A protein has these predicted regions:
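A long amphipathic alpha-helix within ATP-dependent nucleotide-binding catalytic cores
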Residues: 8-19, 60-119
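A short, polar/proline- and glycine-enriched secondary-structure boundary/capping micro-motif
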Residues: 55-62, 131-135
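Short, flexible loop/turn elements at secondary-structure junctions
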Residues: 22-24, 38-40, 113, 125-128
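Contiguous hydrophobic, core-forming segments of folded domains
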Residues: 16, 24-27, 31-35, 43
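Short, surface-exposed beta-strand-loop junctions and turns on beta-sheet-rich folds
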Residues: 51-54, 127-129
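C-terminal active-site "lid" helix and adjoining low-complexity regulatory extension at the edge
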Residues: 113, 118-155
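Beta-strand scaffold of nucleotide-dependent catalytic cores
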Residues: 33-49, 60-61, 120-125
Length: 155
């Protein structure tokens, strides 16, 4: 595997494999993607993506864990939506992310929320967008960095 286009160096010594996953259907509806950014085992930021698997243009929104929209985005212009519905199972998704992220300084836990209320696991990653995404505005980089606390360094 070559790492010329991204910064996913944590995979460099892992033998490449092909993994086939079961297709996730959502009763004919959009598949809502929730990427939960966790720092030291605590969810802090949610990236909600919709229209990702449809013919419409993908939309993404960053939110805090109280479902307040944050004023930044990655790779696409900022879009504010005052009427973004809070998922009924948000607390359950945050609990899952909290459990899975224990022991990691910074990790993103990806989950899917289905129309029947079930939650499906997507992945965990240490390098969002392979570590090369462009945050808008630039101050979002500082905000994300401020959430990382390294024992022995921050003390």
């Amino acid at each position: 595997m070559l790492f010329r286009s991204g910064l996913d160096v944590q995979y460099i010594h892992i033998k490449p494999r092909i993994i086939a996953e079961k297709f996730i259907e959502n009763d004919g509806g959009d598949l809502y993607d929730y990427k939960i950014f966790c720092f030291n085992g605590e969810p802090k930021i949610i990236l909600h993506i919709e229209e990702r698997y449809t013919d419409k243009e993908e939309r993404m929104f960053f939110l805090d864990t109280d479902w307040n929209q944050l004023p930044f985005n990655i790779n696409v212009p900022l879009e504010l939506d005052a009427d973004l519905p809070r998922p009924a199972n948000l607390e359950k998704m945050l609990d899952i992310a909290r459990t899975l992220s224990q022991g990691y300084t910074a990790v993103r836990v990806d989950l899917y929320s289905l129309n029947d209320g079930s939650i499906k696991f997507g992945e965990m990653t240490f390098t969002t967008e392979s570590g090369i995404s462009r945050w808008h505005p630039e101050s979002a980089n500082e905000y994300m960095g401020s959430l990382i606390h390294l024992p022995g360094v921050d003390d």
